[in-house]
Amino acid sequence: MALRAVFFDVGETLVDEERWWRLFAERAGLQPHVIWAALGVTIERGENHNELWGHLGVDPPSSWANDVSYEVGDLYPDAIACLESVRGLGLLVGIVGNQPALMEHWARTEALPADVISSSASLGVKKPDRRFFELVVELAECAASEVAYVGDRVDYDVLPAAAAGLAAIHVRRGPWGMLQATPAEATIGFDDLASLADALASLP
């Protein structure tokens, strides 16, 4: 496998979303552990995480997922080093996930080491739709087999990326990453991003 580009999901891949969930729990008038319990139910049932509000019998905050930007302190400790290391291999590095356009502005403002920054808002389609991954390949300007997609969710990242012909890399952290086992379709599975560049360099 001769990779030319590696694209990264955002939430729970590069960014620890704990602060984000706490903020929305506060806006909904709920304790954080109540939100996390409901989130666990949606993961176990294979539901979209937006269903958690229905399980709790409350309306989502009006600003749900649209006006809260990340902070540089939300990045996982290994995120920047990983992006830089992958870039150091001579590979194109991209960041694109199911995010509002505000994420793109944040990533550029923080000068994250990526050659391509986009979002589902800009692409006009969300994961796990196959078209999302086809557009990722277009952004990479190479063949699908030359692109890797790194994400924490088996259902939204790993399986659909593999089905679209990309190398699918599973990072096992965050709620989904810890509860969803790495499937056979994954090219590689990791508990963090610290050793990703070395693993990519050793791929045939």
Please annotate each region the language model reported:
Residues 8-11, 36-37, 68-70, 120, ...:
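Short, contiguous strand/loop micro-motifs
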Residues 16-20, 78, 99:
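Acidic donor-diphosphate engagement hotspot in glycosyltransferases and nucleotidyltransferases
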Residues 21-28, 49, 65-69, 103-107:
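Hydrophobic alpha-helical core bundles mediating ligand binding, dimerization, or RNAP-core interactions
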